[in-house]
């Protein structure tokens, strides 16, 4: 829309709100192409389609403080007001979303790897999961996010592995731009790339678990 004339046609004092997942540099590029009277906010979200339907999304907003206040009534309708985060200037909303996605993928792979290790060592899967939930390793991943996979073999096709790989690449790009070494991220990204190559772009975001299952001939399923 930046290049097809929409930006130049925006009215004075209107707002450009981008809710996609991108890199901070994208916000600066958009702002540079907007009329100075047009406000720019980057406001990616978390909560998936369920959060969108229920109006309970988490929103991570970057932009001028006055612009964020002006847009907040809209955000309060779309998301949970207690989960509206003013992240800083332009691009910081994008940065928070990339960090969130990267950490979720890291936690997912680490959790699957840990569970597979315990199961192959002879521990009952549900006993192992409950032991971890009741330990300092407790996490939403072990309590909630993995349950569709462990109970039903659901690799979560609601978010494709191709999109997961895109987000991991963007997180890596951000890390290189700001000079942060990301060795764990690099390993997780490689695992996701291998899963994408083996199972296809449309496989779900939890498909890396199938790499472990196929390579060990062991399903991670609660009996």
Where are these regions (language model features)?
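Helical "substrate-binding/catalytic lid" subdomain
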Residues: 92-215
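Rossmann-fold dinucleotide-binding core
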Residues: 2, 21-101, 105
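Hydrophobic alpha-helical segments
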Residues: 215-223
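Short, conserved loop/helix-junction motifs that constitute active-site signature segments
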Residues: 6-12, 77-78
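Short amphipathic alpha-helical/adjacent loop interface patches that line ligand
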Residues: 3, 14, 27, 168, ...
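Mobile acidic interaction elements
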Residues: 13-14, 30, 221-222
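A short helix->loop->beta-strand "cap" motif at the edges of active sites that frequently abuts
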Residues: 10-14, 36-38
């Amino acid at each position: 829309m930046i290049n097809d004339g929409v930006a130049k046609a925006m009215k004075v004092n209107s707002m450009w709100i981008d809710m996609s997942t991108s890199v901070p540099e994208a916000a600066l590029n958009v702002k540079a192409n907007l009329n100075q009277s047009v406000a720019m906010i980057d406001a990616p979200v978390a909560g998936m389609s369920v959060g969108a339907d229920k109006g309970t999304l988490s929103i991570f907003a970057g932009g001028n403080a006055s612009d964020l206040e002006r847009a907040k009534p809209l955000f309060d309708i779309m998301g949970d007001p207690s989960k509206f985060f003013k992240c800083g200037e332009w691009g910081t909303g994008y940065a928070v979303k990339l960090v969130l996605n990267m950490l979720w993928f890291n936690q997912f792979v680490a959790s699957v790897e840990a569970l597979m290790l315990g199961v192959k060592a002879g521990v009952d899967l549900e006993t192992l999961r409950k032991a971890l939930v009741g330990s300092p390793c407790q996490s939403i991943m072990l309590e909630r996010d993995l349950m569709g996979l462990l109970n039903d073999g659901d690799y979560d096709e609601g978010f494709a592995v191709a999109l997961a790989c895109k987000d991991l690449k963007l997180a890596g790009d951000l890390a290189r731009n700001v000079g942060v070494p990301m060795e764990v991220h690099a390993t997780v990204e490689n695992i996701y790339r291998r899963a994408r190559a083996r199972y296809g772009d449309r496989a779900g975001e939890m498909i890396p678990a199938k790499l472990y299952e196929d390579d060990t001939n062991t399903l991670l399923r609660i009996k």
